[in-house]
Amino acid sequence: MNYQKIRPLIHNQIKEFISDTNNLDIAAYFSQGPIHIIFPDIFQENIHKFLSFYKLNWLNDNIYFAHKTNKSHCFLEVALNNNISIDVASKNELIHSLSTGFTWKNISCSWPKSQDFLFLAMKHKCLISIDNIDELKSIIDIYSSGNFPEVEILIRINDLSSSDRIVSSKNTKFWISQHLLPEIYNLLYENKFLNFKWLHFHFDEHQFELKAGSLQNAIDILQQSYELWFAPNIIDIWWGLRGNELLDISDWKKYIDFLAETKKNNWDTHTWWNSAYWVHVSQKWVIEWREIVEKRFRELDPIEFLNNILNFQTHSWNIWDTLIDSMFDLMIEPGYSLTLWCGFTLLKVIGYKDLWNQNSAVIVNANILNLSSKMWKYFVDPIHIQHKKNNNNTHWEFYWYIFWNLCRDDDILMQKKVYFKNKPEIWDYILFMNTSSYISDFEDGSAISQETWIKLIAKKDNNNTFKIYPD
């Protein structure tokens, strides 16, 4: 089989942790189900990269960790102790943040909000990101029904453009179109308790030129609002960047080449039901969906990307100069890029089975819900750790599917076959790397009353020894 591995980029601290199987054995004792292991020191390291960049560029620290990325209480404590803020997307996330110690000064409430969510946010004076005009009207109604403090709001725009290049956000169900700004301004005039301080745009784009063009449009809107006697001074550029997840991006490019070649020649793609991750040949013999699948992984450094945005030339000067001259602050909401490389998931082999056409599969103690496969398709090869060394099969190579323990025919985390140097045996460990961002607990559930996940913290003590304990 012509197999192309997709190797994960692994942080040195995690490499050290998994090199000692005693650490894995200790973690495995905590639960019979999936085990998510997170590393708060790596999370703190990622935070400091952004803080250092902000300090270097004379920017105030408007860095809001996106809570939805990971439910870990430990991550919230690290964020709080390192003086960054938090963005919450639900009432329960707000309660979690408040109970951790965050206050109105460092909480932003975003995404569509229920009446209960709005009520609690207003009681605690949290910054509220306005998702639509009806939400703004709900805030006005709630304010009139009780004793509330001034409400600081952020207006989220979804259709920014640029005067010197074509820039447009994709159609989305979230946020507000620019043509509705006059109606919003009228509501602000009529309700003086609404304090318009922030402008936000949500543009999921990985070309810094386009992001910079949108940022310039946002700056223009802020400057125009001053003519209407408003005084917003902070622009939230969201974030939406993942950073490098692969040891070598060429692994991914070669794998896409493999899928395209096998599909074009009608060969076996070595994927479940020969699906090839949507890559297919059209009636005109054109390879379709390749470009879409390719975008899953990028060779991208988030700090470098942010630096490129600020140094981008527009209107004959760069974005950073415009922000400083206008006395505007820059807010970002990193989630994925803060939790990247901060953890992995440990699974146990519970069996294996033979399939048709000499195919085989290894079965692990988890299911598709445990790694949020509806949110993310997992492509990266896992790491196989033998529980007991077995030298009898080292001369074999195994290309197996990984099955889960749910009673569904689509309960397969990875559609592609996985290469194993040694045959996986019962009690062996299968490690999925970099699962701390939107993967480990984003949509986890205990289907058919299976053992649900447990989250563990791995942190070095003063003796440079890893200590493992529940989150």
Regions found by a protein language model. Give the residues of each.
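A charged N-terminal "starter" segment
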Residues: 1-143, 147-151, 186, 191, ...
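Conserved, mostly hydrophobic/aromatic
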Residues: 43, 68, 90, 121, ...
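Glycine-rich tight-turn/loop motif centered on a GG-T
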Residues: 32, 104-105, 123-127, 166-176, ...
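C-terminal active-site-proximal or functional interface alpha/beta core segments in diverse enzymes
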Residues: 213-215, 223-471
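Rossmann-like NAD(P)H-binding beta-loop-alpha module
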Residues: 143-144, 150, 164-181
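Conserved radical SAM core fold
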Residues: 72, 93-95, 115-117, 159-172, ...
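Non-cysteine beta-strand/loop elements that form the S-adenosyl-L-methionine
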Residues: 89-92, 110-113, 150-164, 197-201, ...
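Active-site glycine- and acidic-residue-rich loops that bind
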Residues: 129-138, 170-179, 205-216, 245-247, ...
